[in-house]
Amino acid sequence: MTIMRKSHPLMKIVNHAFVDLPTPPNISGWWNFGSLLGLCLILQILTGLFLAMHYTSDTLTAFASVTHICREVNYGWLIRYMHANGASLFFICLYIHIGRGIYYGSYLYKETWNIGILLLFMTMATAFVGYVLPWGQMSFWGATVITNLLSAIPYIGQDLVEWIWGGFSVDKATLTRFFAFHFILPFIITALVLVHLLFLHETGSNNPLGIPSDCGKVPFHPYYTTKDFLGVILLIMLFMTLVLFFPDKLGDPDNYTPANPLNTPPHIKPEWYFLFAYAILRSIPNKLGGVIALVSSIMVLALLPYLHTSKQRSLSFRPLSQTLFWMLISDLIILTWIGGQPVESPYIIIGQVASILYFSIILIFMPIAGLVENKMLKW
């Protein structure tokens, strides 16, 4: 008699995805972040569900309801801080996952990569609308500034902004619909994750060498379930250290002040994981130009499969491209720092140079480096 996991229609799907999945024998710890992202998503949905039971999406009571959760709900403070810091953890894993994809040439699986970019956009949208919900100063002004960017779209811009607001300013209607979006988007993300995995399992995983490994593949369980479990333990340790010892380290103190449309904070800025894109947006002294640059900073990832000029897939044996990759990472760290600084000299010029460098490395230098390396290897 065949084993149930191999014969039952539902269990067969799970079996092919997590148990008998043929996996390259040499994938490193950088491949752990896919499963860690799955864990983060489950964590966010569960903590978010419990928060939604006590939260009220009304401008008069939203801030008070968050205070109520922290003070009067059993372990409400823990659920709230797990959810808030869980978002930061989600983006840390997400950026490492994308970085690994760039380094090892995983973007050549075009369908998987494009679904991944769509997932990044959806996650950013979810995090943005979620940041508005506590209805603190930075929530209100962040929502006002970022949604206002849509008014730069020619002809329909202003109508679009007022349609999203549900009025002539960010108010009760905006908060209510943002709560609805924040509740539904994670489930859409979950569906997209399944599509992401579906496309990935069509081709099989890439590996650090960037060469086919069909002849030496091993089953996912027990080898990689064990390996992923180590990553899970380390992640939970890091996460709980952050939540229990430094719960407000990554937040903004301004968000502990209730939203006031008559009082603008001195520095309006998004959460740390959006600062690199915010710096690129601010580096162009034109509203429409800034919005185009902001969208392009993510959409440029979709061009990577078409800009791949090297005969090798991975950067493992390409020192020139490796140098450019780490320059790109350093540049993103500089952009993140600049995004949190006021708009004044010397930050303006540093931000502009870093923004130009970001696009130049991806669009110009990396494809050229690939061609040079081919030439050096006489390929």
Swiss-Prot record:
<keyword id="KW-0408">Iron</keyword>
<feature type="binding site" description="axial binding residue">
    <location>
        <position position="182"/>
    </location>
    <ligand>
        <name>heme b b562</name>
    </ligand>
</feature>
<dbReference type="Pfam" id="PF00033">
    <property type="entry name" value="Cytochrome_B"/>
</dbReference>
<feature type="transmembrane region" description="Helical">
    <location>
        <begin position="226"/>
        <end position="246"/>
    </location>
</feature>
<dbReference type="Pfam" id="PF00032">
    <property type="entry name" value="Cytochrom_B_C"/>
</dbReference>
<dbReference type="InterPro" id="IPR005797">
    <property type="entry name" value="Cyt_b/b6_N"/>
</dbReference>
<dbReference type="GO" id="GO:0008121">
    <property type="term" value="F:ubiquinol-cytochrome-c reductase activity"/>
</dbReference>
<dbReference type="InterPro" id="IPR027387">
    <property type="entry name" value="Cytb/b6-like_sf"/>
</dbReference>
<feature type="binding site" description="axial binding residue">
    <location>
        <position position="97"/>
    </location>
    <ligand>
        <name>heme b b566</name>
    </ligand>
</feature>
<dbReference type="InterPro" id="IPR030689">
    <property type="entry name" value="Cytochrome_b"/>
</dbReference>
<dbReference type="InterPro" id="IPR036150">
    <property type="entry name" value="Cyt_b/b6_C_sf"/>
</dbReference>
<feature type="binding site" description="axial binding residue">
    <location>
        <position position="196"/>
    </location>
    <ligand>
        <name>heme b b566</name>
    </ligand>
</feature>
<dbReference type="GO" id="GO:0005743">
    <property type="term" value="C:mitochondrial inner membrane"/>
</dbReference>
<dbReference type="GO" id="GO:0046872">
    <property type="term" value="F:metal ion binding"/>
</dbReference>
<protein>
    <recommendedName>
        <fullName>Cytochrome b</fullName>
    </recommendedName>
</protein>
<dbReference type="InterPro" id="IPR048260">
    <property type="entry name" value="Cytochrome_b_C_euk/bac"/>
</dbReference>
<feature type="binding site" description="axial binding residue">
    <location>
        <position position="83"/>
    </location>
    <ligand>
        <name>heme b b562</name>
    </ligand>
</feature>
<keyword id="KW-0479">Metal-binding</keyword>
<keyword id="KW-0813">Transport</keyword>
<keyword id="KW-0999">Mitochondrion inner membrane</keyword>
<dbReference type="GO" id="GO:0006122">
    <property type="term" value="P:mitochondrial electron transport, ubiquinol to cytochrome c"/>
</dbReference>
<keyword id="KW-0812">Transmembrane</keyword>
<feature type="transmembrane region" description="Helical">
    <location>
        <begin position="347"/>
        <end position="367"/>
    </location>
</feature>
<comment type="similarity">
    <text>Belongs to the cytochrome b family.</text>
</comment>
<keyword id="KW-0472">Membrane</keyword>
<keyword id="KW-0349">Heme</keyword>
<keyword id="KW-0496">Mitochondrion</keyword>
<feature type="transmembrane region" description="Helical">
    <location>
        <begin position="113"/>
        <end position="133"/>
    </location>
</feature>
<dbReference type="InterPro" id="IPR048259">
    <property type="entry name" value="Cytochrome_b_N_euk/bac"/>
</dbReference>
<feature type="transmembrane region" description="Helical">
    <location>
        <begin position="320"/>
        <end position="340"/>
    </location>
</feature>
<dbReference type="InterPro" id="IPR016174">
    <property type="entry name" value="Di-haem_cyt_TM"/>
</dbReference>
<dbReference type="GO" id="GO:0045275">
    <property type="term" value="C:respiratory chain complex III"/>
</dbReference>
<keyword id="KW-0830">Ubiquinone</keyword>
<feature type="binding site">
    <location>
        <position position="201"/>
    </location>
    <ligand>
        <name>a ubiquinone</name>
    </ligand>
</feature>
<feature type="transmembrane region" description="Helical">
    <location>
        <begin position="288"/>
        <end position="308"/>
    </location>
</feature>
<dbReference type="InterPro" id="IPR005798">
    <property type="entry name" value="Cyt_b/b6_C"/>
</dbReference>
<feature type="transmembrane region" description="Helical">
    <location>
        <begin position="178"/>
        <end position="198"/>
    </location>
</feature>
<keyword id="KW-0679">Respiratory chain</keyword>
<feature type="transmembrane region" description="Helical">
    <location>
        <begin position="33"/>
        <end position="53"/>
    </location>
</feature>
<comment type="function">
    <text>Component of the ubiquinol-cytochrome c reductase complex (complex III or cytochrome b-c1 complex) that is part of the mitochondrial respiratory chain. The b-c1 complex mediates electron transfer from ubiquinol to cytochrome c. Contributes to the generation of a proton gradient across the mitochondrial membrane that is then used for ATP synthesis.</text>
</comment>
<keyword id="KW-1133">Transmembrane helix</keyword>
<keyword id="KW-0249">Electron transport</keyword>
